[in-house]
Amino acid sequence: MTQLTTGKATPHGATYDGHGVNFTLFSAHAERVELCVFDAQGNEVRFDLPGRSGDVWHGYLADARPGLRYGYRVHGPWQPAAGHRFNPAKLLIDPCARRVEGDLHDNPLFHAGYETPDSRDNATIAPKCVVVSDSYNWEDDAPPRTPWGNTVIYEAHVKGLTYQHPEIPAEIRGRYKALGHPVMINYFKRLGITALELMPVIHFASEPRLQRLGLTNYWGYNPMAMFALHPVYACSPESALDEFRDAVKELHKAGIEVILDIVINHSAELDLDGPMFSLRGIDNRSYYWIKEDGDYHNWTGCGNTLNLSNPGVMEYALECLRYWVETCHVDGFRFDLASVMGRTPAFRQDAPLFTAIQNCPVLSQVKLIAEPWDIGEGGYQVGNFPPLFAEWNDHFRDATRRFWLQRNLSLGDFAGRFAGSSDVFNRNGRLPGASINLVTAHDGFTLRDCVCFTNKHNEANGEENRDGSNNNHSNNHGKEGLGGSLDLIERRRDSVHALLTTLLLSQGTPMLLAGDEHGHSQHGNNNAYCQDNALTWLDWERANNGLTDFTAALIHLRQQIPALTRNQWWQENDGNVRWLNKDGQVLSVEEWQHGMTCMQIMLSDRWLIALNATPHLVDIVLPEGEWRAIPPFAGEDNPVVLEVWHGSAHGLCVFQKS
């Protein structure tokens, strides 16, 4: 085989140029790096990477082609107390690999060692990187660039979304291809969503603990290779990249953006008992936040935390994000446990990675959404991210649930969340779209479960129901579990309608959890991360089509209301909003402080939302003018003209002025 030449230090990873492959690897503390190439029979040939530019090792292999399988062995000190854990007996994944074959098994051969390095070679079972070609015919694809004011996000799991869809061809159900199938495109358009936010599609692993329980990591928040697609969602692992890009292209044709949920806060190497397969053996001290005793800072709850303030690691993260935008045309990112991105180790709004992203001509043009917390000290940072970032707003989630399901929130607090949470986000030039409003997400109860379960039921997760949040602000309406009397079903339906209407007609950017518009239930499991089964897969044949129609009508109504689409903060007397009491008069100071009462919200002088959060029927006098109840609260062909709305308990209605 051809010998390696020096090559060059960029771009990251293994890059095919039509004649050969350039390999690069960042390691500040390595003393020697071996590129290991494997043939079809698994025979290994090793080459020392001959070039080093700063902390980047590199080499060029002429005549190498896409499909070549490779990995690395990295030599250096074994000094655990100092954070160094080099062990060339372990074959390592290229952090920038575009494709990975194989999986991590619960096998002692993946262990690096404790006081001394584990000398057992693991190449026969270790995952292998595969060289791929990035070439693709995008035709005339262009990003939709939907303004924040018009954006409605739909959070979905690639497999769970379509795995049980009877109208999707069986061979592509639960796969990337299904996302771009006409059945799904038509559904997204009918529903009215503008952005599909995909739970992790980057190559991930199941934790050894789950493997021992016979479970898998279904959600995918345990990354192995940040540049590689998860192969299980492809019809053919060899074509995963093209299958994903085909789906993105079809979604773009329909005007739908694609947002990736990305995990750049930890890796699947977990804690010191976890497997060594990549970063730990490449440069443990650089990639992770290390304590003085050599252990990991666990600000993620997953055993380790990436040190994104390290220049080399920061560049790795930036290159990863640019790759997904430039090579796969994604339209943005939702950053899991995003406070890690700003740790220096204390959180800073001007942290190096934040500054680099905002100054990047590629990344500054896409949607950036933070989950604005981690579990470390000072990790809760809602409202404190840089100007280009939007953030998940847990204040909105909790206030909306408390108002409708607990009835222990003042009108003033509710109105503040409805109006975009200006107390949290109106700073540094940020606009209301920075508030990602949600009532539910993958993490927690589904919408139906919010009204059917007061307590979590996570026994199937194998942790004796200890996992998952106990602070759900839910209400079973008098009976724990699904089903019940007609009266119970109607009261739960009214609560679901109230929660959805609040979500979709509030100032800010709404995010809808896939399946909530169907009435999907996880039977009270509020942490279904390891449930790859019918508990999490959407059941399209039993979907509540009436609720789907209700949701779609609200989304389409939202797009008609200028106060919600302008993405401007509401000011007093600007015509965007008026807050009225049940008699149609401006709310008094005293009324703002009431915990359980009624109100009316007038938007853009033409739309009126009447709310009754009390447990009783209340007559609400509409303000002066001719008001018609509109879909989905009245028939389109027979609108109801009212002067007084007989407000049902825990209910609401939307009107339009003639």
UniProtKB/Swiss-Prot annotation:
Which GO biological process categories is it annotated with?
A: glycogen catabolic process
For this protein, what is the EC number? Answer: 3.2.1.196
Q: From the UniProt record, list the reaction(s) this protein catalyses.
A: Hydrolysis of (1->6)-alpha-D-glucosidic linkages to branches with degrees of polymerization of three or four glucose residues in limit dextrin
Q: Which GO terms describe its molecular function?
A: glycogen debranching enzyme activity; hydrolase activity, hydrolyzing O-glycosyl compounds
Pfam families per UniProt: Alpha-amylase (PF00128), CBM_48 (PF02922), GlgX_C (PF18390)
SMART domains the UniProt entry points to: Aamy
Gene3D superfamilies given in the database record: Glycosidases, Golgi alpha-mannosidase II, Immunoglobulins
Tree of life domain: Bacteria
Q: Could you list this entry's UniProt keywords, alphabetically sorted.
A: Carbohydrate metabolism, Glycogen metabolism, Glycosidase, Hydrolase
State the residue spans of region: Disordered: 460-484
Which pathway is this protein assigned to?
A: Glycan degradation; glycogen degradation
Q: Tell me yes or no: is Nucleus among this UniProt entry's keywords.
A: no
- Catalytic residues? 336 (nucleophile), 371 (proton donor)
Q: Where is this site: Transition state stabilizer?
A: 443
Q: InterPro entries from the entry?
A: GlgX_C, GlgX_Isoamylase_N_E_set, Glyco_hydro_13_cat_dom, Glyco_hydro_13_N, Glyco_hydro_b, Glycogen_debranch_bac, Glycogen_debranch_GlgX, Glycoside_hydrolase_SF
Q: Family assignment?
A: Belongs to the glycosyl hydrolase 13 family.
Q: Function, please?
A: Removes maltotriose and maltotetraose chains that are attached by 1,6-alpha-linkage to the limit dextrin main chain, generating a debranched limit dextrin.
What's the name of the protein?
Glycogen debranching enzyme
